[in-house]
């Protein structure tokens, strides 16, 4: 028994047509107006508006109030490996930015304690940062670190990279990390920090980093803008 053909929504067809239109266009290229696109694709402005909105969420377009719709910069690709955000982007020739929002000592919650193999209530460092590229905010990150780490804020602000700071200032080397990646929607706090709309699709990543003895030395929660980031996982068969 053959199944009925799937009906493709009109806005999705228009979205595909606009995506083809901007393929190869330079970032910053201005798109025709909604009215012009509606005439070009023989559809309503409402349909065009929905198609454009999805392309904005996908990271293909950017909209500026009063200025129009533009082709967006390509998504930043981050290969998940044992590098810090700062080190990874420097290897790509980009200019990472990092603003330290706070560095505090607190009692570990049950979740933090479990991921760092500590008893609940143990003292940990909490490091909150806003990560970006060339000054554009792209990720909100909170890391929890065990152990005494004197002058952590000063050491971190001097180097920028958390892993470099742990290695050079405290002799802590990371040998492996475990990442969990899932989707999430931007809440009010992340939306305000990252200058995006509430409800924008985000990438939520939890990482646990281990030293060569297998001791957890980092648990990090990172929220990345889904319209600006694409993650790549590289796998290989064991010999």
Language-model features: where?
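Extreme N-terminal segment that seeds HTH/winged-HTH DNA-binding domains in transcriptional regulators
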Residues: 1-45, 50-53, 91
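Short, cationic-aromatic polyanion-contact patches
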Residues: 7-15, 33, 67-83
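Beta-hairpin "wing" of winged helix-turn-helix
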Residues: 31, 56-66, 72
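Extended, compositionally biased flexible segments
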Residues: 39, 45-46, 50-58, 62-63, ...
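C-terminal all-alpha effector/ligand-binding and dimerization domain
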Residues: 96-239
